[in-house]
Amino acid sequence: MTVADTKKSVEQKMQKSIEAFKADLAKVRTGRAHTGLLDHVQVDYYGSMVPISQVAAVSLADARTISVQPWEKKMVQAVEKAIRDGDLGLNPATMGDVIRVPMPPLTEERRRELTKVVKGEAEGAKVAVRNLRRDANEQFKKLVKDKAISEDDERRGQDEVQKLTDKFVAEIDKLVAEKEKEIMTV
């Protein structure tokens, strides 16, 4: 394994950490409706738990309302129950075979709590990125010990991985700032 291989591997893993962080951010409810909010809601579909997107069409009715239309009329109650039990604090209302999910406005206190949650998630993502940097640096030390690369190559590799770490940490900070702005916008 060379410095370039290690760097490429670390970059891919760091990118996966960012993607996981983005997925976690999407679950944080803001005042506006978005279909991604219901992505992790699981529905009991004839005895097996499946994502809501597999049993219903999820769309936006307006800026504060999500519309959910189950493909089978029999599934309306199960989908409504899954949304209600989905720990998002949402209260769906059924109108015929369409479920409307209004987004309640967030209180100032709840907004502040959500920004703390986002910062906590960000710190977890940063720790994951830094752990990947540490693993890469240990890999470089091992390569030097095995005489596969020179100490100069090790230093260059560590510098490149540090630049990657800085880049991904900055991206996390940018995502946090955007999410906080979205949460605090009334």
From Swiss-Prot:
Its main location: cytoplasm. Keywords: Cytoplasm, Protein biosynthesis. InterPro entries: Ribosome_recyc_fac, Ribosome_recyc_fac_dom, RRF_sf. GO terms for cellular component: cytosol. The keyword Transmembrane helix does not apply. It comes from the Bacteria. Transmembrane segments: none annotated. It is found in: Cytoplasm. It holds the Pfam family RRF. One of its GO terms (biological process) is cytoplasmic translational termination. GO terms for molecular function: ribosomal large subunit binding. NCBIfam families: frr. Responsible for the release of ribosomes from messenger RNA at the termination of protein biosynthesis. May increase the efficiency of translation by recycling ribosomes from one round of translation to another. Belongs to the RRF family. PANTHER family: MITOCHONDRIAL RIBOSOME RECYCLING FACTOR PSEUDO 1, RIBOSOME RECYCLING FACTOR. This is Ribosome-recycling factor.
